[in-house]
Amino acid sequence: MDTRFNDINRVKMGDESKSVDGEVNDNTYYSKTDAEVNFEHRYTTPETRLYKKRWVIVCLFSSYSLCNSYQWIQYGIINNIFMRFYGVDSFTIDWMSMIYMLTYIPLIFPVSWLLDKKGLRVIALVAAALNCAGTWIKVASARPDLFPVTFLGQFTCSVAQVFILGMPSRIASVWFGSDEVSTACSIGVFGNQLGIAIGFLVPPILVPNVDDLDELAAHIRVMFYITAGVATFLFVLVVIVFQERPEIPPTLAQAAARRISPESYSYTASILRLLRNKAFILLVITYGLNVGCFYAVSTLLNRMIIEHYPGEEVNAGRIGLTIVVAGMVGSLICGIWLDRSKTYKQTTLAVYLMSLMGLVIYAFTLDLHHLWVVFITAGALGFFMTGYLPLGFEFAVELTYPESEGTSSGLLNCSAQVFGIIFTICQGKIMDSFGTLAGNLFLCAFLLIGTIITGCIKSDLRRQLANQQAQTADHLDTSPTQTRF
């Protein structure tokens, strides 16, 4: 075989090799998704194919992700109403949101291991089943003396979330072409964001702030029944429709990943390799800072708005809706832009900086007593802060290829949950003592730190390198001047 062919067509991400920018990669073990694109012992490129069903899969995932994320914020956005109904304090209702964050931290590692061992379908089934179970537990909790039951339902849904958050990048890699992965990941994140948006909008409408507790219980029960019906329908769809992977892989990198024996994969070794990846660790920190700020703002939004605009529970929900809808637009635009430009670091840094500017403007305009100004500044904040989510996922996959997408996404989300809990508790205490401006400036300081760290991340796009070298190999393999023996 032509020696040029051997040299060019070997993408050994497991060896100590040079990355795009010359940095030495010290990955010395193979992982389950190790794409060693080695064409030494065959003369034809593996077949790749894109199936129309890929859009069904990502949209179905997006739908049950929506149903789960909606429940994350459904208590917090009408914080004052649930406080009165269940007879608990504000901090206790804040924990209905923070339980989503806390549950994620210890469970992400076993769930990531399960994803690598059992695949997408098993994870999807467990997520949809737990989400469905949690909604029906809540149906039974619509009485003032049953707060522990409603907390149990929320806890069950929070466990389901662990099986959801790390999936977008994995679904994108397994089902979509190399020019579609960022867009597909954005669609996966889109569902989560849309669920949060609906969680901001619908509860204040379905559960008005009425004085009669029996009437209030009836409104809460209707909200819980609607959620349970949707969750049950989606669970049935997942059972019937959701498929593990396409029969023929969508990319050469994915085809190479399938040739790696499962027995050669070590989850512990994969985690250790990721922890030695300096660029990825910096991204984990910056992602946690940004998304943690978003979690804190979302959880405490009702308190911020009610402090300056008493009686505006419905508009507090609409402002939250504005934040997330603007973010969904930002996510899709960023995903499409990444697929076309491949400028992962530059785009991530620009969006991070704009998130910081958006939060500063929001902080200083919140108390102007003009709600229309808050809607505009909140929309600008959401466009960039929520739009950052898929950027972090896709940048992580590039930096950590060929490691499992579920593992890298899981570590990002784990960081976000840790910072989310810390920021929510700290900002809440600062707001109680010094007001909303001080609380928001507290978050701005950490976004500034995150922006600086993002600028220090080295752009080592390993997945792009693997696909480029595989395509080069294909070109040489089909060249009429190629000599075969």
UniProtKB/Swiss-Prot annotation:
Leader sequence residues: none
Record's subcellular location: Cell membrane; Mitochondrion membrane; Endoplasmic reticulum membrane
Keywords: Cell membrane, Endoplasmic reticulum, Membrane, Mitochondrion, Transmembrane, Transmembrane helix, Transport
Top-rank lineage group of the source organism: Eukaryota
Primary role: Choline uniporter that specifically mediates choline uptake at the blood-brain-barrier. Responsible for the majority of choline uptake across the blood-brain-barrier from the circulation into the brain. Choline, a nutrient critical for brain development, is a precursor of phosphatidylcholine, as well as betaine. Also mediates transport of ethanolamine. Choline and ethanolamine transport is not coupled with proton transport and is exclusively driven by the choline gradient across the plasma membrane. Also acts as a heme b transporter.
Reaction catalyzed: choline(out) = choline(in); ethanolamine(in) = ethanolamine(out); heme b(in) = heme b(out)
Any GO CC annotation of this UniProt entry: plasma membrane
Record PROSITE patterns: MFS
Cytoplasmic side: 1-46, 118-119, 176-180, 242-277, 342-343, 400-407, 459-485
UniProt keyword Cell membrane, yes or no: yes
Binding residues annotated for choline, in chain numbering: N68, W72, Q161, L165, Y295, Q417
Protein's gene: flvcr2b
GO molecular function, one term: choline transmembrane transporter activity
TM region positions: 47-71, 90-117, 120-139, 147-175, 181-206, 212-241, 278-308, 313-341, 344-366, 370-399, 408-433, 436-458
Membrane disposition: Multi-pass membrane protein
Extracellular side: 72-89, 140-146, 207-211, 309-312, 367-369, 434-435
Annotated Pfam families: MFS_1
Family designation: Belongs to the major facilitator superfamily. Feline leukemia virus subgroup C receptor (TC 2.A.1.28.1) family.
A Gene Ontology biological process term: transport across blood-brain barrier
Name listed for the protein in its UniProt record: Choline/ethanolamine transporter flvcr2b
